[in-house]
């Protein structure tokens, strides 16, 4: 009986959040270990289907770095990285597009639909969903001077075709976006999935941007998980080098999205089963909530 009462209490805890978020849009970046572990894949799919059943509009943007690395290795192509971004020549771009659009996207769509979803796979080239431009990366040399490095076919999002996403939403479909953009001449661009998720969330004026990662969330200098943090404090932690490495572009992506109208951003541990539901529908959450 006690377990049944506990389940009822859990439902009651979620009720205010269910009421608050019905009809809102969540953009979720799906990546990391959650994409490779079978149990976590099922857990993620069920979380997303639950959101949809509660009247929450979900848009998924997925990564695929490990799958790209495996395929490039199979073809004998060696990649260079600048600030964590892959320098992408035409040969590499062909592999990136093949893997992200033709393999990973279809897998994500497949297991969402297997669990009762109405997922539709898209790349940024479909309906010019992600109009893009070449990204030039600023790199500081040993002498302190800054130069711009041509990353090849690495892009940034110029415009999101929200009409396409809203049409899918109106048809009760679940968009699943591969982070491949299209340039003005029809060229393909490899775009960081976190960046795409942030741009899509801003364009849709989303209630939440949620990034699934392979760590617990944002931590302070003592290594303690921060359940909530303001953008100003986030910048301070970067200056203090409490936030370093690959976490910096993630928190900056969240800050940019908040600046452009997204209500809240979350960085959560995708290695935890039902991470999305636990973060959104419990009082404590399991990751870090970032707000202005």
Curated annotation (Swiss-Prot):
Task: Recall the taxonomic lineage recorded for the source organism.
Answer: Bacteria, Pseudomonadati, Thermodesulfobacteriota, Desulfuromonadia, Desulfuromonadales
Record-level GO BP terms? arginine biosynthetic process via ornithine; L-arginine biosynthetic process
Kindly provide the name given to this protein in its UniProt entry: Acetylglutamate kinase
What this chain does, per the entry, is described as: Catalyzes the ATP-dependent phosphorylation of N-acetyl-L-glutamate.
Please indicate if the UniProt record lists Mitochondrion as a keyword: no
The superkingdom listed in its UniProt entry is Bacteria
Q: Which reaction does it catalyse?
A: N-acetyl-L-glutamate + ATP = N-acetyl-L-glutamyl 5-phosphate + ADP
Quote the cellular component terms of the Gene Ontology held in the record: cytoplasm
Concerning Pfam families, the annotation shows:
AA_kinase
């Amino acid at each position: 009986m006690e377990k049944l009462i506990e389940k009822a209490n859990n439902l009651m805890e979620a009720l205010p959040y269910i009421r608050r978020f019905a009809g809102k849009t969540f953009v979720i970046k799906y990546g990391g270990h959650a994409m490779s572990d079978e149990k976590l894949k099922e857990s993620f799919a069920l979380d997303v289907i639950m959101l949809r059943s509660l009247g929450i509009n979900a848009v998924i943007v997925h990564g695929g770095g490990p799958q790209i690395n495996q395929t490039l290795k199979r073809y004998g192509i060696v990649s260079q990285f600048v600030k964590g971004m892959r320098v992408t020549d035409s040969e590499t771009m062909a592999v990136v597009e093949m893997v992200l659009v033709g393999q990973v996207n279809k897998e994500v769509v497949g297991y969402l639909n297997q669990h009762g979803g109405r997922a539709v796979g898209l790349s940024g080239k479909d309906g010019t969903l992600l109009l893009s431009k070449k990204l030039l990366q600023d790199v500081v040399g040993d002498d302190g001077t800054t130069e711009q490095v041509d990353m090849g076919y690495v892009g940034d999002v110029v415009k999101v075709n929200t009409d396409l996403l809203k049409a899918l939403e109106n048809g009760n479909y679940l968009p699943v976006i591969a982070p491949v953009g299209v340039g003005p001449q029809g060229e393909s661009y490899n775009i960081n999935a976190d960046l795409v998720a942030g741009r899509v969330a801003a364009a849709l004026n989303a209630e939440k941007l949620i990034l699934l990662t392979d760590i617990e969330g944002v931590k302070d200098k003592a290594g303690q998980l921060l359940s909530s943090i303001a953008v100003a404090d986030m910048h301070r932690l970067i200056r203090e080098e409490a936030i370093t490495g690959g976490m910096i572009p993630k928190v900056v992506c969240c800050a940019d999205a908040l600046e452009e109208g997204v209500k809240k951003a979350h960085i959560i541990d995708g290695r935890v089963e039902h991470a999305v539901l636990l973060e959104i529908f419990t009082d404590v959450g399991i990751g870090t909530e970032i707000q202005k």
